[in-house]
């Protein structure tokens, strides 16, 4: 079996208007640079898991509001679901599991996913990226990093920094700090098309 370098995951909460592109873009870049990568679309999986649930509105709000509590049976259902998914992620043997944080509404599940993954395999390496850890005033990724819940984070646009990260250049601006570089038009122009091969686009 071929070694898997990166498993890149989209996380709720996002609308189902269109598929989350960030993991698909990063996958295409990694593949073009000789790394192995797959994606997992938890935005879609979460929606279809819970959309017919009688308490869907409460579950949907729970993901977006950090302090919101739900009934114990719903909390257990969420916990069991994320635990199962975390186990599936660990079972892939990926060197790095990437959690894409689109906005602050993904913060709660991002932390839960990281906790579950580390409980299953404390040696599993996790990194976070996305606008939801870049355009915020609070030190969300830094707190998780300092607590050992994640092993790295990438701020800013990831088109160039993901390559540096994959090569082990953790001193590159935006890796484990907020001092990221703006992506140049030249880098954008040579970015390959997003790779949606692991997505079920018919569900959008």
Q: Language model features by range: what are they?
A:
Residues 4-15:
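Nucleotide-activated donor-dependent transferases that construct or modify glycoconjugates
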Residues 188, 192-204:
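Radical SAM [4Fe-4S] cluster-binding motif and immediate context
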Residues 37-83:
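Conserved N-terminal ligand/cofactor-binding loop architecture of enzyme catalytic domains
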Residues 4, 35, 124-125:
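A structural micro-motif
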Residues 14-23:
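Glycine- and acidic-residue-enriched helix-capping/strand-helix junction motifs
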Residues 18, 48-50, 138:
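Short Asp/Glu-rich motifs
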Residues 22, 26-30, 39-44, 75-187:
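Glycine-rich beta-alpha loop elements in corrinoid/cobalamin-binding modules
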Residues 12-14, 72-73, 100-101:
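Short, contiguous strand/loop micro-motifs
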């Amino acid at each position: 079996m071929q070694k898997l370098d990166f498993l890149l995951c989209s996380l709720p909460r996002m609308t189902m208007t269109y598929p989350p592109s960030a993991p698909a873009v990063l996958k295409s870049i990694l593949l073009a640079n000789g790394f192995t990568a797959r994606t997992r679309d938890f935005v879609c999986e979460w929606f279809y898991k819970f959309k017919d649930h009688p308490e869907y509105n409460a579950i949907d709000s729970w993901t977006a509001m950090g302090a919101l509590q739900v009934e114990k049976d719903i909390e257990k259902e969420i916990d069991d679901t994320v635990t199962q998914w975390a186990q599936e992620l660990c079972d892939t043997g990926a060197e790095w599991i990437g959690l894409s944080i689109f906005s602050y509404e993904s913060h709660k599940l991002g932390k839960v996913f990281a906790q579950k993954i580390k409980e299953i395999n404390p040696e599993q390496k996790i990194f976070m990226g996305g606008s939801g850890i870049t355009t915020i005033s609070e030190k969300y990724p830094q707190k998780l990093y300092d607590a050992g819940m994640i092993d790295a984070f990438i701020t800013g646009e990831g088109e160039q920094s993901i390559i540096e990260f994959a090569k082990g250049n953790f001193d590159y601006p935006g890796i484990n700090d907020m001092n990221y570089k703006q992506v140049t038009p030249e880098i954008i122009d040579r970015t390959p098309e997003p790779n949606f091969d692991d997505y079920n686009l018919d569900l959008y």
